[in-house]
């Protein structure tokens, strides 16, 4: 169903809870923007390159309070990168030297974590390196060869990541390759998925840390009553009949796992996680866990004037004892509207996209076991002064991640991409690159990772942000 009955309720039955996390904000006037349902999908602006040098990208990002219209008829006090939610896109190429001049104009410490990028620990933006209010910090790194794909950036302060992301701090990263296998003529769309909990007046409902709702959020993860795409409610994407579009989709939600589908169509999956797959896959639906990204080819199907919805189907990620009553609903995210007939619908998708060699497991330096429970890894909560594992550069490790509880835990390793070996002992059918893997309830996933470079301290954690903030995180020290 493509009407508003399948969009999450905007204003009905919203519990108005006081927010102890709220801080006094000095916010500018409301910035005009389309906040009406079914408006054309807007693309986030691209960060302007301030450098005049070849293969150098120099940009400026400020995190600051702002007022935006996200829910129709209301305004919301948010945190925003350069005044936008989502923030501007960092668009770079493999091999680029990147300089980010960051300014923290928030009333609290923050960081910028470049999720999925293979960069030095000092540039990672972990909670070990907070940027205090009023301070500036330069993040400097090189974009690694062979890492073309879709990534994102978001804050990672100690115990406050969930709050700051909920307030609006997230943006996309696109890494391009000179040998992209897809024709440059294919139109490209960026879709940043988020959800939030809004009160009737448009204010963001982030509950008091001592409230019953906060306790439930810490258990389940905080899901919203409004789903947004690029900060818009139920936008529309126009496509011509027979036209193909390349969609880069990012799950920027704190806890919601999306199960993406377009009724009556197969999805042609090009990439999942840290770059393209070895070959395209045809899928009926695609599971996108927190912080994961997917690249799709979508074809305009149907007669001009017809429309279908990109939907998120029901997915039970919850503990049976705390599962919300409405978990099994289908929600429309956007409308795909056929506007005409494509002049050229003969675009050919290559059978092979790029080589993805399997990581060699002949010589494995360490086999580690990480046991995930509620709020803890291996029975411990996060301590920024403690190193949980020590490893060596130029080695390969296998990690077995065991989830002992009744809900999903998306597991993220900073700084390094990895490959899945098997799930509950069943071998993965082919290698591909990830930086976050979903671990379902009462299951185990084995991953293999090669630590070739970049010494330092690296975080690993559950990417349900409420769990991360609760302490479901550890530190790997590489020498």
Give names to the regions the model predicted.
Residues 11-18:
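Bacterial N-terminal signal peptides
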Residues 142-148, 299-305, 450-457:
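Short, surface-exposed loop/turn segments at beta-strand-coil junctions that are enriched for proline
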Residues 111, 158-164, 168, 303-337, ...:
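Terminal connector regions
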Residues 242-244, 250-251, 290-319:
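A conserved active-site cap/scaffold subdomain adjacent to cofactor or substrate pockets
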Residues 23-289, 296-297, 332-374, 445, ...:
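Histidine-centered copper-binding motifs that mark active-site loops
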Residues 5-10:
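Sec-dependent signal peptide recognition
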């Amino acid at each position: 169903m493509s009407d508003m009955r399948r969009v999450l309720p905007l204003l009905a039955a919203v519990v108005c809870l006081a927010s102890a996390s709220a801080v006094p904000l000095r916010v500018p006037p409301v910035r005009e923007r389309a906040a009406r349902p079914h408006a054309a999908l807007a693309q986030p602006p691209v960060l302007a390159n301030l450098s005049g040098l070849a293969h150098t990208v120099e940009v400026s990002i400020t995190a600051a309070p702002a007022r935006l219209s996200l829910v129709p008829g209301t305004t919301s006090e948010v945190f925003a990168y350069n005044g936008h939610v989502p923030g501007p896109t960092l668009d770079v190429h493999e091999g680029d030297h990147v300089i980010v001049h960051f300014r923290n104009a928030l009333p609290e410490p923050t960081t910028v974590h470049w999720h999925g990028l293979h960069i030095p620990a000092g540039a990672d933006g972990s909670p070990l390196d907070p940027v205090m209010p009023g301070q500036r910090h330069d993040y400097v790194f090189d974009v690694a060869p062979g890492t073309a794909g879709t990534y994102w950036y978001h804050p990672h302060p100690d115990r406050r990541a969930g709050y700051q992301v909920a307030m609006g701090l997230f943006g996309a990263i696109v890494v391009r390759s000179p040998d992209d296998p897809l024709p440059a003529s294919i139109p490209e769309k960026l879709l940043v998925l988020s959800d939030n909990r809004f009160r009737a007046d448009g204010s963001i409902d982030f509950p008091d840390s001592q409230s019953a709702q906060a306790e439930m959020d810490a258990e389940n993860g905080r899901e919203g009553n409004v789903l947004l795409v690029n900060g818009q409610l139920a936008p529309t994407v126009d496509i011509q009949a027979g036209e193909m579009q390349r969609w880069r989709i990012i799950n920027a939600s704190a806890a919601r796992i999306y199960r993406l589908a377009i009724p009556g169509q197969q999805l042609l999956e090009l990439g999942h996680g840290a770059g393209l797959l070895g070959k395209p896959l045809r899928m009926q639906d695609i599971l996108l866990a927190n912080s994961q990204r997917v690249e799709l080819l979508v074809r305009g199907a149907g007669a001009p004037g017809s429309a279908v919805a990109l939907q998120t189907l029901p997915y039970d990620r919850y503990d049976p004892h705390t599962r919300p009553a409405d978990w099994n609903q289908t929600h429309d995210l956007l409308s795909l509207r056929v506007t005409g007939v494509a002049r050229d619908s003969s675009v050919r998708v290559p059978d092979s996209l790029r080589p993805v060699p399997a990581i060699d497991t002949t010589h494995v330096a360490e086999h580690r076991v990480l046991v995930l429970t509620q709020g803890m890894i291996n029975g411990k909560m996060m301590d920024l002064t403690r190193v949980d594992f020590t490893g060596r550069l130029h080695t390969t490790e296998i990690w077995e991640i065991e989830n002992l509880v009744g809900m999903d835990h998306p597991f993220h390793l900073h700084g390094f991409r990895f490959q899945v070996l098997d799930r509950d002992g069943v071998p993965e059918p082919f290698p591909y690159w990830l930086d976050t893997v979903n671990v379902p309830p009462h299951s185990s996933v084995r991953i293999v990772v090669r630590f070739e470079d970049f010494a330092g301290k690296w975080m690993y954690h559950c990417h349900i942000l409420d769990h991360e903030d609760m302490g479901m995180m550890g530190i790997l020290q590489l020498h």
